[in-house]
């Protein structure tokens, strides 16, 4: 296995909270997939959830080497959790096409948050 992509992003949670207070769920609807949006809506700390997903998707787009845009949308990256609660990452559409261009086979993700910040790191590997 070889690392073909690495991305990290950090988000100030208060900034996301302020955006949600000002614009409602507009950002959430742009960033989150339908499944993620359902979790966000029911979450006890929706702004924190959104900040972590935003950081994760930005980190994934950086690992792909494209950033958001250039064929990769927030909607093409899904962040879930496995049965143990660890975060997982799945690519579709433009993000999947870029993953295939890189001849990548797996993505690893780590997400953390503290009082004021959410941070995520994504590593993409090929065989």
From Swiss-Prot:
Gene3D superfamilies: 4'-phosphopantetheinyl transferase domain. It comes from the Bacteria. Its cofactor is Mg(2+). Its EC number is 2.7.8.7. SUPFAM superfamilies: 4'-phosphopantetheinyl transferase. Mg(2+) binds at residues 9, 58. GO terms for molecular function: holo-[acyl-carrier-protein] synthase activity; magnesium ion binding. The keyword Magnesium applies. GO terms for cellular component: cytoplasm. GO terms for biological process: fatty acid biosynthetic process. InterPro entries: 4-PPantetheinyl_Trfase_dom (IPR008278), 4-PPantetheinyl_Trfase_dom_sf (IPR037143), ACPS (IPR002582), Ppantetheine-prot_Trfase_dom (IPR004568). It is found in: Cytoplasm. It catalyses: apo-[ACP] + CoA = holo-[ACP] + adenosine 3',5'-bisphosphate + H(+). Transmembrane segments: none annotated. Pfam families: ACPS. Transfers the 4'-phosphopantetheine moiety from coenzyme A to a Ser of acyl-carrier-protein. Belongs to the P-Pant transferase superfamily. AcpS family. This is Holo-[acyl-carrier-protein] synthase. It comes from Shewanella baltica (strain OS155 / ATCC BAA-1091).
């Amino acid at each position: 296995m070889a690392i073909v992509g690495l991305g990290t992003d950090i988000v100030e949670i208060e900034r996301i909270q302020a955006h949600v207070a000002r614009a409602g769920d507009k950002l959430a609807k742009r960033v989150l997939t339908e499944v993620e949006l359902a979790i966000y809506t029911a979450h006890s700390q929706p702004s924190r959830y959104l900040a972590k997903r935003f950081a994760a998707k930005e980190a994934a787009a950086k690992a792909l080497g494209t950033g958001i845009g250039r064929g990769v949308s927030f909607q093409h990256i899904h962040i879930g959790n496995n049965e143990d609660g660890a975060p997982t990452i799945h690519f579709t559409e433009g993000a999947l096409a870029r993953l295939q261009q890189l001849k990548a086979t797996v993505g690893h993700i780590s997400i953390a948050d503290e009082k004021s910040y959410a941070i995520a790191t994504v590593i993409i590997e090929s065989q």
